[in-house]
């Protein structure tokens, strides 16, 4: 099962998913809007101000709580150090997978991702498939 946790607003995330007809592959989607709604709820109930955006693992743990099928593990694929920090802070045991595809300075990004705790760093999706399959 695949899910999305993005720091982008809902309108941006859904635009891309709908444009490329990908939404059907992601039954669970959390966006910046979900973080803001939960922050407002917490403030209203507890008068506490906090940020649930990454690197806070809120979205990842919410995804894990909403998974209805048996899972043997969780992987979080991201291209920023904050993504790996969120994975490592998750109480749900996410493994951080750093993706170098979008980086103009792949060596620098690889160092940053490893430094903040990436469990894996990959250059393509074939490597991701091997990780998930345990090879």
Predicted regions and their residues:
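Short acidic-hydrophobic, aromatic-tinged amphipathic segments that line or gate anion-handling sites
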Residues: 119-127
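Acidic, Mg2+-coordinating phosphoryl-transfer loop and its flanking beta/alpha structural elements
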Residues: 75-120
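Proline-centered loop/turn at the N-terminus of a beta-strand
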Residues: 1-3, 95
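Short amphipathic alpha-helix with an adjacent loop that forms part of the alpha/beta core around
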Residues: 127-135
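Substrate-recognition "cap/lid" segment bordering the active-site pocket of phosphatases
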Residues: 3, 9-75, 82-89, 107
